Amino acid sequence: MQTYVALLYSIILGEGRRVVMADLKAMAEGLGLKNPRTLVATGNLVFETKATDIVKLEQRLEVAFEKTFGRHVDIIVRRADDWLTLAAGNPFPAESAATPDQVAVRVMRKPVPAEAAATLQAYVGKDEKMQAVGGDIWIVFSRATPSSRLIAATSHKRLGIGTSRNWNTVRRLAEMFGG
């Protein structure tokens, strides 16, 4: 059995409705996924299943999500060992220790090309930092300027399918995998 994490892009279903994590777990169980569990109510699902193709697993989850909740949501899946590598690759450990809610990673379905990551530097604010690691985008956001230009610059339209998680979530998911 292989352990995976599924990251939902959004848990907002519209009209003030949100995905209930118990319903998300039930959906996973209905797919035959073992030991499904969630971390915080922001769309982080950890589970076990036989080793399988990530793209096919993402597609299965997305189809089941739309059938269960009536809305398509992009879902990015990573193997536990890949998540541990992502967490260990955090290029901003000092900032993560000081302000973990201000450090985030944009986890990408497909690695961001180096040239696309380089163009993001133009959007980095005075008190911000950005670095691409392993095809994902790490950002240190400024507390002084809460409306970062990087948020729009890292959108699906510009970089492809991805979803962001702050350092607290990254770390806690890694701990769920024994990291």
Language model features by range: what are they?
Residues Q2-G179:
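Surface-exposed, charge/polar-rich loops and edge strands
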